[in-house]
């Protein structure tokens, strides 16, 4: 069935925010007495599930909202350093030109995402929802679908984390995983998205068949 509503995650899907996320990781790690000296350490953590990452830091689950708040503060100060993934702008503009509704549903702050989009002249999205619940992202996805009167078979979500895939599955919509973001490809594959792509070019070729 045609996909009229195409939803994107932001960090690790549209924007390469790993370098600024590393700065946030460093601050958080230092708070827990852990030295994080390289992005390789952060990438190693991304091979683990979120629960296992918290265990590695000895961080209780109830602390997650506080950590997210601190990370957001750091990202707000440094978002101008982030870059759009190569080929992503062309993909987004092509989808828009072909008549698709494109929107962002992200757990990041709306103000941070808007600052990035403005700096890259990406005023092409039909809507944006920020601060989507970390482990209940389907609530925000459902809200976006309702806004555009989109049915499940008309909607597809694209993200780089297992929680994106799990949220989409709980909602009953198709979901595409992308392996250039945060979660390791092995984790994404195990969560069984409808398709998993290694490059923006491969994703583009697929989306242009919809």
What is each residue range found by the language model?
Residues 77-107, 114, 139:
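Short, acidic loop-to-helix structural element flanking the phosphoryl-transfer center
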Residues 45, 83, 87, 108, ...:
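Short beta->alpha linker loops
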Residues 41-42, 123-135:
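A short, structured active-site edge motif that brings together acidic residues
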Residues 3-89:
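N-terminal helical cap/lid subdomain that shapes the substrate entry/recognition surface
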Residues 5, 138-165:
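Conserved Lys-Pro-Asp/Glu-containing loop-to-beta segment of HAD-superfamily phosphomonoesterases
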Residues 120-128, 187-207:
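Structural recognition of alpha->loop->beta junctions
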Residues 98-100, 148-154, 210:
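Glycine-rich phosphate-binding loop signature in dinucleotide/nucleotide-binding domains
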